[in-house]
C-alpha cells in the first residue's frame, strides 16, 4: 500500500508498463582444466577473454623434450609433454571467446600428473555458474584408468550441474582402429564411460594442426640427446664429404660442434671470428643438413598433434555466435587443422556413428575438394530419441537455464492466478522469440511450444498448500537432417 500523503504538493508514481522477460543465457563459455606454465593459485577458476590474457596470467608452455635415436623417429619425453597451451591456441583459432581456466599445477617435468588434480578442479567449477562446456585436454596424458576416471567424473559433474556438457577426447586417438576389442581404441573408449552419456560428446581421431610454426622449433628441444644428434650429423658429413680437408665438410662439422659447445663466457678476442648464436646455428643446419631438417620437422609434426576437444569448443562458440545453439556443430571445418591423424571411410564411420550400444563417436574426416570437416553431431547417448543430437541437448540446457533464471523473480510471490498468468506469458514470449529465430519447429507458435501452469492443469490444491508452483513447458526442437536420401526413378517417354 502506498504511503499516506499528508503534505500538499505534486507526487510522482512510476508504474512498470512491461512484465519481466527471460534473458537467454550464454551457450558457449568453456571451462578448460589442465596444467599451465604458471599456476598463480591452483584450482581457482579464472575467467579470460583472449589468448593474450591467458599468457599474461598463466604463461606459455615450457619446451617438450624429445629423444633422438639413430634410425628411430624422435619421441617426446612423457614427463615434459603438456597440451593445454597449444589447445588454447587451437580454441581461439577456431572462434573461441570468453572462457574459464582452472590450473591444476605447473607444466614442469617435476609435476606428477594425477587424476585427482582434475577431480578437484571439477569440484571448484561447481561454484561457477557461467561455464557451459567442460574440456580437459591434458587428461589424455594420464594412464588409461586415470583418463577413464576423469572422463566419467566430467560427465557426472555435468549431470549434477545440469547446465553444461563435456567434450571428451578418445584416449590414444592417433591410433588406427583394430578388429580386436582388447586393442581397439574406440571399444576401449566406450568401455571406459558408462553413465550420464547425454551430457557428453567425443570426436575421433586427433588432428594434425599448424599451431606450432617452424620459427618456434630449434635444437633446444633435444637437450638431453644433442650429442647423439651430433654423432649422426657427423656421420652425414663424412658420407657426403669423404675428403676430410674439404672446406664445406669442415664448415659443416664446425656447425655440428657448435650444437654441443658450451655458451661463451666472454666476448671473442680481437681477430677471432664471432661465436654463432643458437638461431644462426639452427638456420645454417636447416639449410645444409637433410638429417637435421628431418629431425626438426618430426619435432614440429609431433607438437602439432592435438586432441580435438579444445578446437571443437571453439567451433561450438563460432557456430553459436553466428547461427545459434540450435544449429548442429557439424559439416563445418576446423581452422588451423591440416588433416586428421587417421583417415576414416564412410564404411568405417558406420560403427562410430551408430553402434549397438549407442555410444556414438563423431568422426573428423577429409573430403576431396572440401578439406577437413566435422562429420557427426551425436552425443554419447545415441540410442536416446530425446538426447541423440548435440544441438538438442545444448538447446534444452539453454532454454532450461534461461527460464530458470527468470523464474527466480517469482519465488515467494503469491501462488495465485495472476502470478501464473504472468509466468506463463513471460515464458511464452521468450519461446516465441526462439521460434522466430529458428530454434523451434512449427508453422505457428502454438505448434512449436506450449506452456501450462495453474490449478487443475499442473497443480493440485495440495501443491498450492505446500508452496509448489508447477510449470510444464513442451518444445518442438530442431533436429539435424543427418541422412539425406534422394530417390531417382526413370519414367516413360511421353512425347
Located regions from the model:
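Phosphate-interacting basic helix/loop segments used at nucleotide- and nucleic-acid interfaces
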Residues: 114-118
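Short, small/polar-rich motifs associated with maturation and membrane association
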Residues: 109-112
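DUTPase catalytic domain/fold
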Residues: 150-151
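Structured, hydrophobic secondary-structure cores that serve as assembly/anchoring elements
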Residues: 1-100, 105-107, 120, 126-142, ...
Amino acid at each position: 500500500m502506498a504511503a499516506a500523503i499528508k503534505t500538499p504538493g505534486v507526487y510522482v508514481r512510476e508504474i512498470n508498463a512491461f512484465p519481466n522477460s527471460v534473458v537467454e543465457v550464454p551457450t558457449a563459455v568453456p571451462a578448460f582444466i589442465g596444467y599451465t606454465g604458471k599456476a598463480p593459485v591452483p584450482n581457482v577458476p579464472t575467467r579470460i577473454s583472449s589468448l593474450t590474457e591467458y599468457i599474461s596470467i598463466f604463461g606459455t608452455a615450457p619446451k617438450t623434450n624429445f629423444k633422438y635415436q639413430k634410425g628411430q623417429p624422435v619421441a617426446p619425453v612423457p614427463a615434459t609433454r603438456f597440451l593445454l597451451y597449444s589447445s588454447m591456441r587451437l580454441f581461439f583459432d577456431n572462434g573461441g571467446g570468453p572462457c574459464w581456466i582452472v590450473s591444476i599445477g605447473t607444466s614442469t617435468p617435476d609435476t606428477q600428473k594425477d587424476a585427482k588434480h582434475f577431480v578437484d578442479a571439477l569440484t571448484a567449477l561447481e561454484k561457477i555458474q557461467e561455464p557451459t562446456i567442460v574440456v580437459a585436454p591434458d587428461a589424455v596424458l594420464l594412464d588409461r584408468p586415470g583418463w577413464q576416471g576423469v572422463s566419467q567424473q566430467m560427465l557426472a559433474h555435468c549431470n549434477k550441474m545440469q547446465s553444461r556438457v563435456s567434450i571428451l577426447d578418445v584416449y590414444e586417438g592417433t591410433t588406427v582402429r583394430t578388429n580386436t576389442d582388447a586393442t581397439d581404441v574406440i571399444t576401449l573408449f566406450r568401455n571406459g564411460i558408462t553413465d550420464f552419456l547425454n551430457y557428453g560428446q567425443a570426436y575421433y581421431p586427433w588432428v594434425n594442426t599448424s599451431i606450432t610454426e617452424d620459427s618456434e622449433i630449434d635444437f633446444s628441444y633435444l637437450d638431453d640427446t644433442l650429442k647423439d644428434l651430433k654423432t649422426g650429423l657427423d656421420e652425414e658429413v663424412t658420407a657426403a664429404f669423404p675428403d676430410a680437408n674439404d672446406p664445406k665438410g669442415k664448415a659443416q662439422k664446425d656447425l655440428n660442434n657448435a650444437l654441443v659447445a658450451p655458451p661463451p663466457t666472454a666476448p671473442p678476442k680481437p681477430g677471432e671470428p664471432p661465436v654463432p648464436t643458437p638461431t644462426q646455428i639452427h638456420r645454417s643446419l636447416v639449410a645444409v643438413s637433410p638429417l637435421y631438417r628431418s629431425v626438426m620437422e618430426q619435432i614440429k609434426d609431433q607438437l602439432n598433434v592435438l586432441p580435438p576437444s579444445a578446437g571443437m569448443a571453439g567451433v561450438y562458440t563460432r557456430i553459436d555466435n553466428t547461427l545459434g545453439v540450435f544449429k548442429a556443430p557439424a559439416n563445418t571445418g576446423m581452422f588451423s587443422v591440416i588433416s586428421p591423424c587417421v583417415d576414416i571411410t564412410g564404411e568405417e564411420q558406420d560403427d562410430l556413428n551408430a553402434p549397438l550400444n549407442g555410444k556414438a563417436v563423431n568422426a573428423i574426416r577429409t573430403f576431396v575438394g572440401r578439406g577437413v570437416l566435422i562429420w557427426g553431431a551425436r552425443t554419447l547417448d545415441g540410442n536416446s530419441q530425446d538426447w541423440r543430437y548435440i544441438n538438442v541437448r545444448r538447446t534444452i540446457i539453454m532454454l532450461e537455464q534461461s527460464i530458470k533464471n527468470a523464474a527466480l523473480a517469482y519465488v515467494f510471490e503469491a501462488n495465485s492466478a495472476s502470478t501464473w498468468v504472468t509466468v506463463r506469458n513471460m515464458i511464452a514470449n521468450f519461446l516465441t522469440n526462439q521460434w522466430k529465430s529458428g530454434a523451434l519447429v512449427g508453422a505457428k507458435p502454438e505448434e512449436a511450444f506450449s506452456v501450462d501452469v495453474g490449478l487443475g492443469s499442473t497443480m493440485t490444491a495440495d501443491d498450492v498448500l505446500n508452496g509448489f508452483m508447477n510449470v510444464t513447458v513442451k518444445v518442438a526442437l530442431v533436429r539435424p537432417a543427418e541422412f539425406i536420401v534422394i530417390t531417382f526413378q526413370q519414367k516413360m517417354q511421353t512425347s
